[in-house]
């Protein structure tokens, strides 16, 4: 996919719960969605956002993925990691998947996205991760579900997707939002119109970002094919025709960035080292197909 606009796309930021997208694309191919899981008390008592798990064998893997991607359950993230053989194994596999996607800015330290020293991602990498997820029917189904029934010890209750644009923005597919006091607001999402998909990523946003996401998507659909791309999303390593060289964090400056809407213009200089002083980083990749996400060749290729 072509990158239509970007600010500090490889800057390192805390991903918060957007990292759950990486958890999902790592585990969806591995876990039987009908398998019944009994979460540990430790998983059920994880801090932060939770779906409300109890240590009883009443949940399927499918239930846990809904809880992970719809309501950002940190308890569900840990329960899925347990079902996969444990935290250490799951984190190692998440980082392997990131390397395969050439998401070299990303280091996962938790399956939930809760802040940990050294955990990081970038707007560019979250776009790579979202693209990989959208190619998975299961992932696409989970992130686009508005409301679902969730098991309880006696019966069930309803959970509703945290994506405020789902069902309100034309063509919105979904993906994942996140927030912590250190990461601030983050979002990676996708919308499809007339067979074309736009992915938008915002990181370290200080406030309400939903209107800005809608503005960015509007702009992306309006200018697609009319502006010179500033880069392109690299393919996964398995799709590259020859072995990739040792990864480097290349971020060539585009000679002329395309015009962007006011919502896409960051008010402060980007700081690539930690992201602490940059209030926003985003990338707007475009693709030619809703599933394959293939775009035109970019004028400036971001090589790693």
Residue ranges and their predicted role:
Residues 2-124, 128-137:
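Active-site-adjacent loops and short helices of periplasmic peptidoglycan-processing enzymes
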Residues 104, 111, 115-304:
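Domain-terminus/edge residues, biased toward the C-terminal soluble/receptor-binding domains
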